[in-house]
A protein has these predicted regions:
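Stable alpha-helical elements in mature extracytoplasmic
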Residues: 11, 103-107, 171, 186-190, ...
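A short, well-structured edge-of-sheet supersecondary motif
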Residues: 38-39, 105-140
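Non-catalytic propeptide/linker segments at domain boundaries
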Residues: 43-115
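Short, charged, amphipathic alpha-helices and their helix-cap/turn boundaries
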Residues: 102-104, 130-135, 209-235, 261-280
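Active-site SXXK
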Residues: 129, 146-172, 193, 248-253, ...
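Active-site helix/loop module of the DD-peptidase/beta-lactamase fold
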Residues: 165-201, 228-231, 258-297
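Conserved catalytic neighborhood of penicillin-recognizing serine enzymes
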Residues: 181-237, 241-247
Protein backbone atom coordinates (compact mmCIF):
# COMPACT_ATOMS: atom_id res chain seq x y z
CA UNK A 1 0.00 0.00 0.00
CA UNK A 2 2.66 2.54 1.03
CA UNK A 3 4.83 2.13 -2.06
CA UNK A 4 1.93 2.07 -4.47
CA UNK A 5 0.34 5.24 -3.08
CA UNK A 6 3.60 7.11 -2.47
CA UNK A 7 5.42 6.23 -5.69
CA UNK A 8 2.58 6.03 -8.21
CA UNK A 9 0.20 8.70 -6.89
CA UNK A 10 -2.65 6.20 -7.01
CA UNK A 11 -5.43 6.42 -4.47
CA UNK A 12 -5.67 3.99 -1.57
CA UNK A 13 -9.06 2.95 -2.96
CA UNK A 14 -7.49 2.00 -6.32
CA UNK A 15 -4.85 -0.07 -4.56
CA UNK A 16 -7.43 -1.89 -2.47
CA UNK A 17 -9.46 -2.71 -5.59
CA UNK A 18 -6.71 -3.63 -8.05
CA UNK A 19 -3.83 -4.86 -5.90
CA UNK A 20 -4.95 -5.99 -2.46
CA UNK A 21 -8.31 -7.59 -3.28
CA UNK A 22 -7.02 -11.15 -2.89
CA UNK A 23 -7.63 -13.74 -0.14
CA UNK A 24 -5.98 -12.99 3.22
CA UNK A 25 -4.47 -9.72 1.99
CA UNK A 26 -7.96 -8.23 1.64
CA UNK A 27 -8.52 -8.90 5.33
CA UNK A 28 -5.87 -6.37 6.28
CA UNK A 29 -6.86 -3.00 7.68
CA UNK A 30 -4.59 -0.29 6.31
CA UNK A 31 -4.00 3.21 7.60
CA UNK A 32 -1.88 5.62 5.60
CA UNK A 33 -0.77 9.22 6.09
CA UNK A 34 0.99 9.66 2.75
CA UNK A 35 4.47 9.07 4.19
CA UNK A 36 3.83 5.75 5.91
CA UNK A 37 1.29 2.95 6.07
CA UNK A 38 0.37 0.50 8.81
CA UNK A 39 -1.48 -2.74 8.16
CA UNK A 40 -2.85 -5.43 10.45
CA UNK A 41 -5.27 -8.36 10.29
CA UNK A 42 -7.88 -8.47 13.06
CA UNK A 43 -5.72 -5.99 14.97
CA UNK A 44 -2.82 -8.45 15.16
CA UNK A 45 0.73 -8.40 13.75
CA UNK A 46 0.71 -4.76 12.73
CA UNK A 47 3.47 -3.88 10.25
CA UNK A 48 4.55 -0.41 9.25
CA UNK A 49 6.21 0.88 6.09
CA UNK A 50 7.87 4.30 6.00
CA UNK A 51 8.51 6.28 2.82
CA UNK A 52 11.47 8.47 1.95
CA UNK A 53 11.99 10.58 -1.15
CA UNK A 54 14.48 8.88 -3.45
CA UNK A 55 14.33 5.56 -1.62
CA UNK A 56 10.69 4.57 -1.81
CA UNK A 57 9.12 2.69 1.08
CA UNK A 58 10.60 0.25 3.57
CA UNK A 59 9.07 -2.19 6.04
CA UNK A 60 10.33 -1.37 9.53
CA UNK A 61 10.18 -3.08 12.91
CA UNK A 62 10.38 -2.00 16.54
CA UNK A 63 14.11 -1.31 16.21
CA UNK A 64 13.59 1.39 13.58
CA UNK A 65 14.97 4.77 14.66
CA UNK A 66 13.36 7.66 12.74
CA UNK A 67 16.13 9.99 13.91
CA UNK A 68 18.83 8.18 11.94
CA UNK A 69 19.60 10.02 8.72
CA UNK A 70 19.20 7.74 5.71
CA UNK A 71 21.50 8.34 2.70
CA UNK A 72 19.62 8.94 -0.54
CA UNK A 73 20.94 8.01 -4.01
CA UNK A 74 22.63 10.93 -5.75
CA UNK A 75 21.07 10.73 -9.17
CA UNK A 76 21.94 12.47 -12.42
CA UNK A 77 19.03 11.83 -14.74
CA UNK A 78 20.14 12.05 -18.34
CA UNK A 79 17.25 13.48 -20.30
CA UNK A 80 17.67 13.10 -24.04
CA UNK A 81 15.63 13.63 -27.16
CA UNK A 82 15.55 9.95 -28.05
CA UNK A 83 12.41 7.88 -28.27
CA UNK A 84 11.87 4.28 -27.18
CA UNK A 85 13.91 2.17 -26.57
CA UNK A 86 16.80 4.64 -26.09
CA UNK A 87 14.95 7.40 -24.26
CA UNK A 88 11.60 8.41 -22.84
CA UNK A 89 10.41 10.83 -25.51
CA UNK A 90 7.24 10.04 -27.41
CA UNK A 91 7.94 7.39 -30.07
CA UNK A 92 7.38 8.11 -33.72
CA UNK A 93 4.06 6.90 -35.09
CA UNK A 94 5.30 4.11 -37.35
CA UNK A 95 3.02 1.74 -39.27
CA UNK A 96 4.35 -1.65 -40.37
CA UNK A 97 2.58 -3.14 -43.41
CA UNK A 98 3.13 -6.69 -42.18
CA UNK A 99 1.42 -6.13 -38.81
CA UNK A 100 -2.29 -6.92 -38.44
CA UNK A 101 -3.25 -4.07 -36.12
CA UNK A 102 -6.84 -5.27 -35.72
CA UNK A 103 -5.64 -8.63 -34.42
CA UNK A 104 -3.09 -6.88 -32.25
CA UNK A 105 -5.83 -4.75 -30.68
CA UNK A 106 -7.96 -7.84 -30.04
CA UNK A 107 -5.03 -9.53 -28.33
CA UNK A 108 -4.43 -6.53 -26.10
CA UNK A 109 -8.13 -6.30 -25.25
CA UNK A 110 -8.11 -10.00 -24.38
CA UNK A 111 -5.43 -9.35 -21.78
CA UNK A 112 -7.91 -7.18 -19.87
CA UNK A 113 -10.88 -9.57 -19.92
CA UNK A 114 -11.87 -11.25 -16.65
CA UNK A 115 -9.63 -8.65 -15.05
CA UNK A 116 -10.95 -9.17 -11.56
CA UNK A 117 -8.85 -12.35 -11.75
CA UNK A 118 -6.09 -11.44 -14.23
CA UNK A 119 -5.51 -7.96 -12.80
CA UNK A 120 -3.69 -6.75 -15.92
CA UNK A 121 -2.42 -3.20 -15.52
CA UNK A 122 -0.62 -2.56 -18.80
CA UNK A 123 0.17 -4.17 -22.14
CA UNK A 124 2.99 -2.90 -24.33
CA UNK A 125 3.99 -4.42 -27.67
CA UNK A 126 7.16 -3.46 -29.55
CA UNK A 127 8.40 -4.46 -33.00
CA UNK A 128 11.72 -3.47 -34.56
CA UNK A 129 12.43 -0.88 -31.85
CA UNK A 130 8.99 0.74 -32.21
CA UNK A 131 5.98 0.62 -29.92
CA UNK A 132 3.12 -0.74 -32.02
CA UNK A 133 0.55 -1.42 -29.31
CA UNK A 134 -0.15 -0.01 -25.87
CA UNK A 135 -3.07 -0.28 -23.46
CA UNK A 136 -3.57 0.67 -19.82
CA UNK A 137 -6.05 -0.09 -17.08
CA UNK A 138 -8.09 2.93 -16.00
CA UNK A 139 -6.00 4.95 -13.56
CA UNK A 140 -2.71 3.88 -15.16
CA UNK A 141 -0.75 5.76 -17.84
CA UNK A 142 2.53 5.41 -19.70
CA UNK A 143 4.15 7.28 -16.81
CA UNK A 144 2.77 5.17 -13.94
CA UNK A 145 5.52 3.25 -12.11
CA UNK A 146 4.71 -0.43 -11.64
CA UNK A 147 6.40 -2.86 -9.28
CA UNK A 148 8.78 -5.01 -11.31
CA UNK A 149 8.91 -7.90 -8.82
CA UNK A 150 11.36 -10.48 -10.19
CA UNK A 151 12.37 -8.31 -13.14
CA UNK A 152 14.44 -6.58 -10.46
CA UNK A 153 16.70 -9.64 -10.52
CA UNK A 154 17.70 -8.72 -14.08
CA UNK A 155 18.76 -5.26 -12.92
CA UNK A 156 20.94 -6.75 -10.19
CA UNK A 157 22.47 -9.35 -12.52
CA UNK A 158 23.25 -6.62 -15.07
CA UNK A 159 25.18 -4.68 -12.42
CA UNK A 160 27.37 -7.73 -11.89
CA UNK A 161 27.81 -7.99 -15.64
CA UNK A 162 28.98 -4.38 -15.77
CA UNK A 163 31.50 -4.99 -12.99
CA UNK A 164 32.85 -8.05 -14.81
CA UNK A 165 33.07 -6.16 -18.12
CA UNK A 166 35.06 -3.42 -16.39
CA UNK A 167 37.44 -6.00 -14.93
CA UNK A 168 36.45 -5.16 -11.37
CA UNK A 169 35.14 -8.59 -10.42
CA UNK A 170 35.79 -12.26 -11.11
CA UNK A 171 32.51 -14.13 -11.23
CA UNK A 172 34.31 -17.41 -10.67
CA UNK A 173 35.82 -16.35 -7.36
CA UNK A 174 34.47 -18.17 -4.26
CA UNK A 175 32.03 -16.14 -2.20
CA UNK A 176 33.30 -17.41 1.18
CA UNK A 177 30.78 -15.90 3.54
CA UNK A 178 31.58 -16.23 7.22
CA UNK A 179 31.08 -19.88 8.17
CA UNK A 180 31.11 -21.17 4.61
CA UNK A 181 34.81 -22.00 4.73
CA UNK A 182 34.02 -24.86 7.13
CA UNK A 183 31.86 -26.89 4.73
CA UNK A 184 31.06 -27.52 1.07
CA UNK A 185 29.63 -24.00 0.69
CA UNK A 186 33.22 -22.80 0.28
CA UNK A 187 32.97 -23.99 -3.33
CA UNK A 188 30.11 -21.59 -4.20
CA UNK A 189 31.06 -18.77 -6.58
CA UNK A 190 29.31 -15.60 -7.71
CA UNK A 191 28.61 -17.36 -10.99
CA UNK A 192 26.77 -20.14 -9.17
CA UNK A 193 24.66 -17.58 -7.30
CA UNK A 194 23.84 -15.59 -10.43
CA UNK A 195 22.71 -18.77 -12.17
CA UNK A 196 20.82 -19.97 -9.06
CA UNK A 197 22.86 -23.16 -9.10
CA UNK A 198 24.50 -22.78 -5.69
CA UNK A 199 22.91 -25.90 -4.22
CA UNK A 200 21.73 -23.93 -1.19
CA UNK A 201 18.42 -24.84 0.42
CA UNK A 202 15.56 -22.40 -0.30
CA UNK A 203 11.76 -22.49 -0.43
CA UNK A 204 10.20 -20.01 -2.87
CA UNK A 205 6.50 -20.40 -2.00
CA UNK A 206 4.22 -17.36 -1.83
CA UNK A 207 1.13 -19.31 -0.72
CA UNK A 208 2.47 -20.06 2.76
CA UNK A 209 4.90 -18.91 5.41
CA UNK A 210 8.11 -19.87 3.64
CA UNK A 211 11.70 -18.75 3.25
CA UNK A 212 10.77 -16.08 0.73
CA UNK A 213 7.73 -14.66 2.55
CA UNK A 214 9.60 -14.51 5.87
CA UNK A 215 12.47 -12.70 4.15
CA UNK A 216 10.36 -10.14 2.26
CA UNK A 217 7.89 -9.36 5.02
CA UNK A 218 9.76 -10.02 8.27
CA UNK A 219 13.53 -9.58 7.83
CA UNK A 220 15.14 -6.22 8.55
CA UNK A 221 18.23 -7.42 6.64
CA UNK A 222 17.15 -9.47 3.63
CA UNK A 223 20.71 -10.22 2.53
CA UNK A 224 21.25 -12.78 5.30
CA UNK A 225 18.47 -15.33 4.81
CA UNK A 226 20.01 -17.32 1.95
CA UNK A 227 23.53 -17.26 3.34
CA UNK A 228 22.37 -18.98 6.52
CA UNK A 229 20.94 -21.95 4.60
CA UNK A 230 22.74 -25.27 4.33
CA UNK A 231 23.87 -26.83 1.06
CA UNK A 232 21.60 -29.63 -0.15
CA UNK A 233 23.47 -30.22 -3.40
CA UNK A 234 26.82 -29.45 -4.97
CA UNK A 235 27.11 -26.27 -7.08
CA UNK A 236 25.64 -26.73 -10.62
CA UNK A 237 24.01 -30.03 -9.56
CA UNK A 238 20.52 -28.52 -9.28
CA UNK A 239 18.77 -25.30 -10.28
CA UNK A 240 16.56 -23.70 -7.63
CA UNK A 241 14.78 -20.38 -8.12
CA UNK A 242 15.60 -18.20 -5.13
CA UNK A 243 14.82 -14.59 -4.28
CA UNK A 244 17.06 -15.11 -1.27
CA UNK A 245 20.00 -15.63 -3.60
CA UNK A 246 19.33 -12.31 -5.33
CA UNK A 247 19.31 -10.47 -2.02
CA UNK A 248 22.46 -12.28 -0.92
CA UNK A 249 24.06 -10.93 -4.11
CA UNK A 250 22.81 -7.46 -3.20
CA UNK A 251 24.59 -7.76 0.14
CA UNK A 252 27.79 -9.00 -1.51
CA UNK A 253 27.63 -6.05 -3.90
CA UNK A 254 27.34 -3.66 -0.96
CA UNK A 255 30.56 -4.99 0.58
CA UNK A 256 32.50 -4.03 -2.56
CA UNK A 257 32.05 -0.34 -1.80
CA UNK A 258 33.80 1.71 0.88
CA UNK A 259 30.69 3.66 1.84
CA UNK A 260 26.96 3.11 1.87
CA UNK A 261 26.55 6.21 -0.30
CA UNK A 262 28.69 4.64 -3.03
CA UNK A 263 26.59 1.47 -2.85
CA UNK A 264 23.22 3.17 -3.21
CA UNK A 265 24.56 5.41 -5.97
CA UNK A 266 25.96 2.55 -8.01
CA UNK A 267 22.85 1.07 -9.72
CA UNK A 268 21.84 4.54 -10.90
CA UNK A 269 25.30 5.70 -11.99
CA UNK A 270 26.31 2.45 -13.69
CA UNK A 271 23.01 1.51 -15.32
CA UNK A 272 19.66 3.10 -14.52
CA UNK A 273 20.35 6.80 -15.09
CA UNK A 274 23.18 6.12 -17.52
CA UNK A 275 20.80 4.62 -20.09
CA UNK A 276 17.93 7.01 -19.43
CA UNK A 277 15.65 4.89 -17.20
CA UNK A 278 14.77 7.98 -15.20
CA UNK A 279 11.49 6.67 -13.80
CA UNK A 280 13.10 3.59 -12.21
CA UNK A 281 13.59 3.41 -8.46
CA UNK A 282 14.96 0.56 -6.35
CA UNK A 283 13.75 0.18 -2.77
CA UNK A 284 15.83 -0.99 0.18
CA UNK A 285 15.26 -3.06 3.30
CA UNK A 286 15.50 -1.54 6.78
CA UNK A 287 19.28 -1.99 6.83
CA UNK A 288 19.71 -0.09 3.57
CA UNK A 289 20.27 -3.06 1.25
CA UNK A 290 18.65 -2.96 -2.18
CA UNK A 291 15.92 -5.60 -2.36
CA UNK A 292 17.45 -7.00 -5.53
CA UNK A 293 14.93 -9.80 -5.76
CA UNK A 294 11.77 -7.79 -6.05
CA UNK A 295 11.47 -4.07 -5.37
CA UNK A 296 12.31 -2.04 -8.47
CA UNK A 297 9.65 0.32 -9.79
CA UNK A 298 9.44 1.72 -13.33
CA UNK A 299 6.85 2.56 -15.93
CA UNK A 300 6.11 -0.09 -18.56
CA UNK A 301 8.09 1.59 -21.33
CA UNK A 302 11.20 1.74 -19.16
CA UNK A 303 10.77 -1.92 -18.26
CA UNK A 304 10.70 -2.91 -21.91
CA UNK A 305 13.64 -0.61 -22.68
CA UNK A 306 15.68 -2.56 -20.14
CA UNK A 307 14.79 -5.78 -21.94
CA UNK A 308 16.13 -4.29 -25.17
CA UNK A 309 19.38 -3.29 -23.48
CA UNK A 310 19.89 -6.73 -21.98
Amino acid sequence: MASTVFLTNRSAESVELNDNDVPLINLAEVETDGKSATASVFGLMARKAICNEGLGCTLVNKDYDPNIKIPVPQRVKNDNDLAFPYGDKEPKDTVFPNVDYDQLQKAMDQAFTNNEVQKTRTVLVAHKNHIIGEKYLEGFTKDTPILGWSMTKSVLATLYGILEYEGKIDLNEPVLLEGWEKDDRKKITLNHLLRMQSGLEWEEDYTSISDVTRMLFMDADMTKAQGEKKAIAAPTEVWNYSSGTSNLLSGILRKRFKTHQEYINYPYQALIDKIGMSSMLMETDMKGNFVGSSYAWANTRIGLSLDYCI
